UniProtKB/Swiss-Prot annotation:
Its EC number is 6.1.1.21. This is Histidine--tRNA ligase. One of its GO terms (cellular component) is cytoplasm. It is found in: Cytoplasm. InterPro entries: aa-tRNA-synth_II, aa-tRNA-synth_II/BPL/LPL, Anticodon-bd, Anticodon-bd_dom_sf, His-tRNA-ligase, HisRS-like_core, HisRS/HisZ, HisRS_anticodon. Homodimer. It catalyses: tRNA(His) + L-histidine + ATP = L-histidyl-tRNA(His) + AMP + diphosphate + H(+). Its main location: cytoplasm. Disulfide bonds: none annotated.
Protein backbone atom coordinates (compact mmCIF):
# COMPACT_ATOMS: atom_id res chain seq x y z
CA UNK A 1 0.00 0.00 0.00
CA UNK A 2 1.41 3.37 -1.03
CA UNK A 3 2.20 5.90 1.66
CA UNK A 4 -0.48 8.57 1.82
CA UNK A 5 0.83 12.10 2.12
CA UNK A 6 -1.00 14.39 4.52
CA UNK A 7 -1.46 17.64 2.63
CA UNK A 8 -1.97 20.91 4.44
CA UNK A 9 -5.46 22.40 4.40
CA UNK A 10 -6.19 25.16 1.92
CA UNK A 11 -8.74 26.76 4.26
CA UNK A 12 -7.78 30.04 5.97
CA UNK A 13 -7.43 30.28 9.74
CA UNK A 14 -10.81 30.27 11.52
CA UNK A 15 -12.43 33.69 11.52
CA UNK A 16 -10.26 35.10 8.72
CA UNK A 17 -10.79 35.49 4.97
CA UNK A 18 -8.88 34.99 1.76
CA UNK A 19 -9.28 37.89 -0.63
CA UNK A 20 -9.23 36.55 -4.18
CA UNK A 21 -9.10 39.22 -6.91
CA UNK A 22 -12.89 39.65 -7.09
CA UNK A 23 -13.12 40.08 -3.28
CA UNK A 24 -10.10 42.38 -3.37
CA UNK A 25 -11.80 44.61 -5.94
CA UNK A 26 -14.77 44.94 -3.60
CA UNK A 27 -12.55 45.67 -0.60
CA UNK A 28 -10.55 48.27 -2.50
CA UNK A 29 -13.76 49.91 -3.72
CA UNK A 30 -15.15 50.09 -0.18
CA UNK A 31 -11.89 51.48 1.20
CA UNK A 32 -11.61 54.03 -1.61
CA UNK A 33 -15.12 55.40 -0.89
CA UNK A 34 -14.38 55.64 2.83
CA UNK A 35 -10.98 57.21 2.24
CA UNK A 36 -12.32 59.69 -0.32
CA UNK A 37 -15.11 60.79 2.04
CA UNK A 38 -12.88 61.27 5.08
CA UNK A 39 -10.21 63.09 3.06
CA UNK A 40 -12.88 65.50 1.84
CA UNK A 41 -13.29 66.66 5.46
CA UNK A 42 -9.58 67.51 5.69
CA UNK A 43 -8.49 64.44 7.67
CA UNK A 44 -5.02 62.91 7.34
CA UNK A 45 -4.22 59.21 7.17
CA UNK A 46 -1.88 57.51 9.64
CA UNK A 47 -0.89 53.96 10.57
CA UNK A 48 0.97 52.16 13.33
CA UNK A 49 2.49 48.74 14.09
CA UNK A 50 0.31 45.67 14.26
CA UNK A 51 2.32 44.57 17.33
CA UNK A 52 2.26 46.60 20.54
CA UNK A 53 3.28 46.06 24.15
CA UNK A 54 0.73 44.02 26.09
CA UNK A 55 0.78 46.69 28.80
CA UNK A 56 -0.69 49.23 26.38
CA UNK A 57 -3.87 47.20 25.96
CA UNK A 58 -3.95 46.16 29.60
CA UNK A 59 -4.11 49.83 30.56
CA UNK A 60 -6.24 51.17 27.71
CA UNK A 61 -8.60 48.47 26.41
CA UNK A 62 -11.68 47.04 28.07
CA UNK A 63 -11.66 44.06 30.40
CA UNK A 64 -13.33 41.72 27.89
CA UNK A 65 -10.75 42.46 25.20
CA UNK A 66 -7.71 41.95 27.44
CA UNK A 67 -8.90 38.85 29.28
CA UNK A 68 -10.70 36.95 26.51
CA UNK A 69 -10.03 38.38 23.07
CA UNK A 70 -6.40 39.47 22.91
CA UNK A 71 -3.83 37.59 20.82
CA UNK A 72 -0.70 37.94 22.97
CA UNK A 73 2.59 36.08 23.35
CA UNK A 74 6.15 36.36 24.64
CA UNK A 75 8.56 37.33 21.87
CA UNK A 76 12.16 36.14 21.50
CA UNK A 77 13.35 39.05 23.63
CA UNK A 78 11.12 37.92 26.52
CA UNK A 79 8.74 40.85 25.96
CA UNK A 80 5.01 40.33 26.25
CA UNK A 81 3.43 41.71 23.09
CA UNK A 82 -0.03 41.65 21.53
CA UNK A 83 -1.56 41.88 18.07
CA UNK A 84 -3.72 45.00 17.96
CA UNK A 85 -7.41 44.36 18.72
CA UNK A 86 -8.27 48.04 18.25
CA UNK A 87 -6.50 51.15 17.01
CA UNK A 88 -7.25 53.66 19.77
CA UNK A 89 -4.39 52.69 22.16
CA UNK A 90 -1.86 53.04 19.32
CA UNK A 91 -3.47 56.33 18.37
CA UNK A 92 -3.23 57.60 21.95
CA UNK A 93 0.45 56.64 22.14
CA UNK A 94 1.26 58.35 18.83
CA UNK A 95 -0.63 61.55 19.64
CA UNK A 96 0.93 61.81 23.11
CA UNK A 97 4.39 61.22 21.67
CA UNK A 98 4.11 64.13 19.24
CA UNK A 99 1.60 66.34 21.02
CA UNK A 100 3.62 69.56 21.00
CA UNK A 101 4.13 69.43 17.24
CA UNK A 102 0.54 68.69 16.22
CA UNK A 103 -1.54 71.65 14.97
CA UNK A 104 -5.02 71.56 16.47
CA UNK A 105 -7.63 70.47 15.83
CA UNK A 106 -6.02 67.16 14.93
CA UNK A 107 -7.97 65.23 12.29
CA UNK A 108 -6.64 61.70 11.71
CA UNK A 109 -7.97 58.47 10.21
CA UNK A 110 -6.73 54.95 9.47
CA UNK A 111 -8.02 51.69 7.98
CA UNK A 112 -6.05 49.01 9.88
CA UNK A 113 -6.64 45.30 10.18
CA UNK A 114 -7.51 44.25 13.74
CA UNK A 115 -7.49 40.91 15.56
CA UNK A 116 -9.73 39.60 18.34
CA UNK A 117 -10.07 36.01 19.51
CA UNK A 118 -13.83 35.59 19.55
CA UNK A 119 -16.41 33.21 18.16
CA UNK A 120 -16.94 34.04 14.47
CA UNK A 121 -20.53 34.81 13.55
CA UNK A 122 -22.68 37.09 11.45
CA UNK A 123 -20.90 40.41 11.17
CA UNK A 124 -18.07 39.25 13.44
CA UNK A 125 -14.71 37.72 12.52
CA UNK A 126 -11.35 37.30 14.24
CA UNK A 127 -9.63 39.53 11.71
CA UNK A 128 -11.31 42.53 10.14
CA UNK A 129 -10.48 45.95 8.74
CA UNK A 130 -11.90 49.08 10.30
CA UNK A 131 -12.09 52.72 9.36
CA UNK A 132 -11.10 54.73 12.44
CA UNK A 133 -11.80 58.47 12.44
CA UNK A 134 -10.73 60.74 15.30
CA UNK A 135 -10.87 64.47 15.99
CA UNK A 136 -8.93 65.96 18.94
CA UNK A 137 -8.67 69.33 20.56
CA UNK A 138 -12.25 70.59 20.19
CA UNK A 139 -14.24 70.78 23.42
CA UNK A 140 -17.49 72.13 21.99
CA UNK A 141 -20.34 70.27 20.28
CA UNK A 142 -18.92 71.35 16.90
CA UNK A 143 -16.74 68.23 17.09
CA UNK A 144 -19.82 66.00 17.47
CA UNK A 145 -21.45 67.94 14.65
CA UNK A 146 -18.59 67.20 12.25
CA UNK A 147 -18.20 63.55 13.25
CA UNK A 148 -21.92 62.79 12.92
CA UNK A 149 -22.05 64.64 9.62
CA UNK A 150 -19.18 62.49 8.37
CA UNK A 151 -20.76 59.27 9.67
CA UNK A 152 -23.85 60.17 7.65
CA UNK A 153 -21.85 61.27 4.58
CA UNK A 154 -20.04 57.93 4.31
CA UNK A 155 -23.24 55.92 3.87
CA UNK A 156 -24.66 58.52 1.50
CA UNK A 157 -21.46 58.28 -0.56
CA UNK A 158 -22.18 54.56 -0.93
CA UNK A 159 -25.65 55.45 -2.21
CA UNK A 160 -27.61 54.52 0.92
CA UNK A 161 -31.15 55.92 0.60
CA UNK A 162 -32.91 57.87 3.35
CA UNK A 163 -34.58 55.43 5.71
CA UNK A 164 -32.09 52.61 5.18
CA UNK A 165 -30.24 53.52 8.38
CA UNK A 166 -30.67 55.46 11.61
CA UNK A 167 -28.15 57.39 13.71
CA UNK A 168 -29.02 56.75 17.35
CA UNK A 169 -27.59 59.30 19.78
CA UNK A 170 -27.30 59.50 23.56
CA UNK A 171 -24.93 60.87 26.22
CA UNK A 172 -22.88 59.07 28.88
CA UNK A 173 -23.57 61.74 31.49
CA UNK A 174 -27.27 61.21 30.91
CA UNK A 175 -26.89 57.52 31.76
CA UNK A 176 -24.56 58.22 34.69
CA UNK A 177 -27.00 60.71 36.21
CA UNK A 178 -29.86 58.24 35.79
CA UNK A 179 -27.98 55.40 37.48
CA UNK A 180 -26.49 57.47 40.30
CA UNK A 181 -29.17 60.10 40.94
CA UNK A 182 -32.43 58.54 39.74
CA UNK A 183 -31.76 54.94 40.81
CA UNK A 184 -29.35 55.92 43.61
CA UNK A 185 -26.94 53.07 42.83
CA UNK A 186 -23.45 52.67 44.28
CA UNK A 187 -20.40 52.77 42.01
CA UNK A 188 -20.27 48.97 42.09
CA UNK A 189 -23.93 48.73 41.11
CA UNK A 190 -23.50 51.36 38.39
CA UNK A 191 -20.72 49.31 36.83
CA UNK A 192 -22.75 46.08 36.85
CA UNK A 193 -25.99 47.63 35.59
CA UNK A 194 -24.16 49.52 32.83
CA UNK A 195 -22.52 46.35 31.53
CA UNK A 196 -25.88 44.60 31.58
CA UNK A 197 -27.61 47.45 29.74
CA UNK A 198 -24.85 47.33 27.14
CA UNK A 199 -25.68 43.71 26.26
CA UNK A 200 -29.46 44.00 26.72
CA UNK A 201 -30.20 43.75 22.99
CA UNK A 202 -28.24 40.47 22.78
CA UNK A 203 -30.15 38.60 25.52
CA UNK A 204 -33.79 37.74 26.16
CA UNK A 205 -35.99 39.99 28.33
CA UNK A 206 -36.23 37.15 30.85
CA UNK A 207 -32.45 36.82 31.09
CA UNK A 208 -32.03 40.59 31.41
CA UNK A 209 -34.56 40.76 34.23
CA UNK A 210 -33.02 37.80 36.06
CA UNK A 211 -29.47 39.17 35.83
CA UNK A 212 -30.33 42.74 36.83
CA UNK A 213 -32.46 41.77 39.83
CA UNK A 214 -29.51 41.06 42.21
CA UNK A 215 -27.96 44.43 41.29
CA UNK A 216 -30.94 46.52 42.44
CA UNK A 217 -32.00 47.53 45.94
CA UNK A 218 -35.74 47.86 45.31
CA UNK A 219 -36.34 45.70 42.25
CA UNK A 220 -39.95 46.54 41.37
CA UNK A 221 -39.58 50.29 41.69
CA UNK A 222 -36.10 50.55 40.14
CA UNK A 223 -36.80 48.11 37.30
CA UNK A 224 -39.94 50.06 36.39
CA UNK A 225 -37.87 53.25 36.30
CA UNK A 226 -35.27 51.57 34.07
CA UNK A 227 -38.01 50.58 31.61
CA UNK A 228 -39.31 54.16 31.65
CA UNK A 229 -35.82 55.52 30.98
CA UNK A 230 -35.10 53.13 28.10
CA UNK A 231 -38.44 53.94 26.43
CA UNK A 232 -38.12 57.71 26.82
CA UNK A 233 -37.64 60.37 24.16
CA UNK A 234 -35.99 63.79 24.46
CA UNK A 235 -39.15 65.27 25.95
CA UNK A 236 -40.06 62.55 28.45
CA UNK A 237 -36.52 61.78 29.66
CA UNK A 238 -36.27 65.25 31.19
CA UNK A 239 -39.19 64.43 33.52
CA UNK A 240 -37.24 61.63 35.23
CA UNK A 241 -35.96 62.91 38.61
CA UNK A 242 -32.18 63.31 38.84
CA UNK A 243 -31.48 63.37 35.09
CA UNK A 244 -28.60 65.63 34.00
CA UNK A 245 -30.23 68.63 32.23
CA UNK A 246 -26.99 69.70 30.50
CA UNK A 247 -26.85 66.42 28.55
CA UNK A 248 -30.40 66.90 27.30
CA UNK A 249 -29.66 70.49 26.33
CA UNK A 250 -26.50 69.33 24.50
CA UNK A 251 -28.37 66.75 22.42
CA UNK A 252 -31.21 69.15 21.59
CA UNK A 253 -28.77 71.76 20.28
CA UNK A 254 -26.88 69.11 18.34
CA UNK A 255 -30.06 67.77 16.73
CA UNK A 256 -31.20 71.26 15.80
CA UNK A 257 -27.97 72.12 13.98
CA UNK A 258 -27.74 68.71 12.29
CA UNK A 259 -31.32 69.18 11.14
CA UNK A 260 -30.35 72.47 9.54
CA UNK A 261 -27.62 70.53 7.71
CA UNK A 262 -30.17 68.07 6.34
CA UNK A 263 -29.68 64.89 8.33
CA UNK A 264 -32.53 65.20 10.83
CA UNK A 265 -34.48 62.33 9.21
CA UNK A 266 -31.76 59.87 10.21
CA UNK A 267 -31.35 61.10 13.81
CA UNK A 268 -32.98 59.31 16.74
CA UNK A 269 -32.50 59.89 20.46
CA UNK A 270 -31.99 56.48 22.10
CA UNK A 271 -31.03 56.35 25.80
CA UNK A 272 -30.28 52.62 25.55
CA UNK A 273 -27.05 53.34 23.64
CA UNK A 274 -24.15 52.51 26.00
CA UNK A 275 -20.99 52.07 23.84
CA UNK A 276 -18.67 50.65 26.52
CA UNK A 277 -18.77 51.74 30.13
CA UNK A 278 -15.04 52.36 30.66
CA UNK A 279 -14.34 54.32 27.51
CA UNK A 280 -16.70 57.13 26.53
CA UNK A 281 -17.33 60.23 28.62
CA UNK A 282 -19.78 62.34 26.61
CA UNK A 283 -21.96 62.12 23.51
CA UNK A 284 -22.23 58.59 22.06
CA UNK A 285 -23.86 57.28 18.89
CA UNK A 286 -24.48 54.17 16.83
CA UNK A 287 -25.54 53.81 13.21
CA UNK A 288 -28.17 51.09 12.73
CA UNK A 289 -29.28 49.22 9.63
CA UNK A 290 -33.08 49.37 9.33
CA UNK A 291 -33.32 46.39 6.95
CA UNK A 292 -35.39 43.65 8.66
CA UNK A 293 -32.87 41.07 7.41
CA UNK A 294 -29.94 42.88 9.03
CA UNK A 295 -31.37 44.98 11.86
CA UNK A 296 -28.17 45.61 13.77
CA UNK A 297 -25.56 48.19 14.70
CA UNK A 298 -23.23 49.00 11.81
CA UNK A 299 -20.78 51.27 13.59
CA UNK A 300 -20.54 53.87 16.28
CA UNK A 301 -18.41 56.08 18.45
CA UNK A 302 -18.43 58.99 20.81
CA UNK A 303 -16.60 61.51 22.97
CA UNK A 304 -13.64 60.60 25.18
CA UNK A 305 -11.83 63.17 27.30
CA UNK A 306 -8.98 61.05 28.66
CA UNK A 307 -7.31 59.86 25.47
CA UNK A 308 -3.67 60.47 26.44
CA UNK A 309 -3.93 60.34 30.24
CA UNK A 310 -1.63 57.31 30.41
CA UNK A 311 1.15 59.14 28.60
CA UNK A 312 0.88 62.80 29.56
CA UNK A 313 -0.44 65.17 32.23
CA UNK A 314 -1.96 67.30 29.49
CA UNK A 315 -5.66 66.83 28.86
CA UNK A 316 -6.82 66.36 25.29
CA UNK A 317 -10.47 65.84 24.41
CA UNK A 318 -11.40 63.74 21.45
CA UNK A 319 -14.26 62.16 19.56
CA UNK A 320 -14.26 59.43 16.95
CA UNK A 321 -15.86 56.34 15.48
CA UNK A 322 -14.99 53.00 13.93
CA UNK A 323 -16.62 51.36 10.89
CA UNK A 324 -15.78 47.70 10.24
CA UNK A 325 -15.60 46.23 6.75
CA UNK A 326 -17.66 43.13 7.64
CA UNK A 327 -20.76 45.00 8.80
CA UNK A 328 -20.40 47.57 6.02
CA UNK A 329 -20.29 44.86 3.35
CA UNK A 330 -23.39 43.21 4.84
CA UNK A 331 -25.22 46.55 4.76
CA UNK A 332 -24.24 47.21 1.14
CA UNK A 333 -25.34 43.72 0.09
CA UNK A 334 -28.69 43.92 1.88
CA UNK A 335 -29.49 47.26 0.24
CA UNK A 336 -28.15 46.29 -3.23
CA UNK A 337 -25.56 49.07 -3.20
CA UNK A 338 -22.58 47.16 -4.60
CA UNK A 339 -21.98 48.07 -8.27
CA UNK A 340 -20.69 45.80 -11.00
CA UNK A 341 -16.98 45.65 -10.24
CA UNK A 342 -16.00 43.51 -13.22
CA UNK A 343 -13.03 44.64 -15.26
CA UNK A 344 -15.01 46.56 -17.88
CA UNK A 345 -12.67 49.54 -17.74
CA UNK A 346 -9.62 47.48 -18.67
CA UNK A 347 -8.54 46.11 -22.01
CA UNK A 348 -7.42 42.62 -23.03
CA UNK A 349 -4.86 42.28 -25.81
CA UNK A 350 -4.24 38.78 -27.26
CA UNK A 351 -1.20 37.82 -29.31
CA UNK A 352 -2.39 37.00 -32.81
CA UNK A 353 0.94 35.55 -33.97
CA UNK A 354 4.42 35.05 -32.51
CA UNK A 355 5.88 37.14 -35.34
CA UNK A 356 4.11 40.27 -34.05
CA UNK A 357 4.74 39.71 -30.34
CA UNK A 358 6.91 42.85 -30.07
CA UNK A 359 4.34 44.96 -31.98
CA UNK A 360 1.62 43.77 -29.60
CA UNK A 361 3.69 44.68 -26.56
CA UNK A 362 4.54 48.09 -28.04
CA UNK A 363 0.80 48.75 -28.42
CA UNK A 364 0.01 47.67 -24.86
CA UNK A 365 2.89 49.82 -23.57
CA UNK A 366 1.52 52.82 -25.49
CA UNK A 367 -1.97 52.28 -24.05
CA UNK A 368 -0.69 52.01 -20.46
CA UNK A 369 1.38 55.16 -20.86
CA UNK A 370 -1.86 56.91 -21.82
CA UNK A 371 -3.65 55.68 -18.71
CA UNK A 372 -5.52 52.66 -20.12
CA UNK A 373 -5.18 49.48 -18.05
CA UNK A 374 -4.16 46.73 -20.44
CA UNK A 375 -3.47 43.03 -19.94
CA UNK A 376 -1.47 41.29 -22.66
CA UNK A 377 -1.26 37.55 -23.27
CA UNK A 378 2.24 36.10 -23.09
CA UNK A 379 1.89 33.40 -25.75
CA UNK A 380 0.09 32.96 -29.05
CA UNK A 381 -2.39 30.24 -28.15
CA UNK A 382 -5.40 29.72 -30.40
CA UNK A 383 -7.35 32.97 -30.53
CA UNK A 384 -10.51 31.24 -29.28
CA UNK A 385 -8.72 30.11 -26.12
CA UNK A 386 -7.32 33.60 -25.56
CA UNK A 387 -10.81 35.09 -25.80
CA UNK A 388 -12.04 32.48 -23.31
CA UNK A 389 -9.38 33.72 -20.89
CA UNK A 390 -10.63 37.29 -21.37
CA UNK A 391 -14.24 36.23 -20.75
CA UNK A 392 -13.34 34.24 -17.65
CA UNK A 393 -11.44 37.19 -16.22
CA UNK A 394 -14.41 39.51 -16.74
CA UNK A 395 -13.08 41.69 -19.57
CA UNK A 396 -15.56 43.43 -21.78
CA UNK A 397 -13.28 44.66 -24.57
CA UNK A 398 -10.66 42.74 -26.55
CA UNK A 399 -8.28 44.55 -28.90
CA UNK A 400 -6.90 42.64 -31.90
CA UNK A 401 -3.66 43.55 -33.66
CA UNK A 402 -2.81 41.28 -36.59
CA UNK A 403 -0.54 41.61 -39.63
CA UNK A 404 -3.30 43.23 -41.71
CA UNK A 405 -3.98 45.78 -38.95
CA UNK A 406 -0.28 46.62 -38.79
CA UNK A 407 -0.25 47.24 -42.57
CA UNK A 408 -3.36 49.44 -42.47
CA UNK A 409 -2.45 51.14 -39.16
CA UNK A 410 -5.69 50.03 -37.54
CA UNK A 411 -6.87 47.73 -34.75
CA UNK A 412 -10.02 45.69 -34.22
CA UNK A 413 -12.00 46.02 -30.98
CA UNK A 414 -14.64 43.52 -29.88
CA UNK A 415 -17.31 44.01 -27.23
CA UNK A 416 -17.64 40.61 -25.52
CA UNK A 417 -21.05 41.59 -24.09
CA UNK A 418 -22.77 42.66 -27.33
CA UNK A 419 -20.55 40.73 -29.74
CA UNK A 420 -20.05 43.87 -31.82
CA UNK A 421 -16.66 44.31 -33.51
CA UNK A 422 -15.31 47.36 -35.33
CA UNK A 423 -12.12 48.79 -36.79
CA UNK A 424 -10.36 51.75 -35.17
CA UNK A 425 -7.42 53.85 -36.43
CA UNK A 426 -4.08 53.52 -34.61
CA UNK A 427 -3.61 57.28 -34.68
CA UNK A 428 -5.27 58.78 -31.64
CA UNK A 429 -6.34 55.31 -30.44
CA UNK A 430 -6.03 56.08 -26.72
CA UNK A 431 -8.25 59.16 -27.03
CA UNK A 432 -10.86 57.19 -28.99
CA UNK A 433 -10.91 54.42 -26.39
CA UNK A 434 -11.32 56.90 -23.55
CA UNK A 435 -14.02 58.94 -25.28
CA UNK A 436 -16.09 56.32 -27.06
CA UNK A 437 -15.49 53.29 -24.82
CA UNK A 438 -14.84 55.08 -21.50
CA UNK A 439 -11.67 53.12 -20.86
Amino acid sequence: MENQKNFLTTAPYKGTRDFYPEEMRLRNWMFSIMRETVLSFGYEEYDGPILESFDLYKAKSGEEIVERQLYDFIDKGERRVAIRPEMTPTLARMVAGNLRNLPRPVRWFSIPNLWRYEQPGKGRLREHWQLNVDLFGVDTHRAELEILLMADSILKKFGAPTGSYQIKVSHRKLLDSFLKNSLKLSDHQVHGVSKLLDKKSKISPETFEAEIKPLLNNFNEQFSLIETYLASNLETVSTIPGIDPDSIHFIRNLFQELGELGIDKQLVFDPSIIRGFDYYTGCIFEVFDTNPENRRSLYGGGRYDNLIGLFSKEQLSGIGFGLGDVTLKSFLENHNLIPDLSREKTLFLPIMDESIFVDTFKLSKELRENGILTETMLDSAKIGKQIQVAEKKGYRYVLFLGESEIRTETVQIKDLVSGEQKSLPRKGLSDILKKDFRL
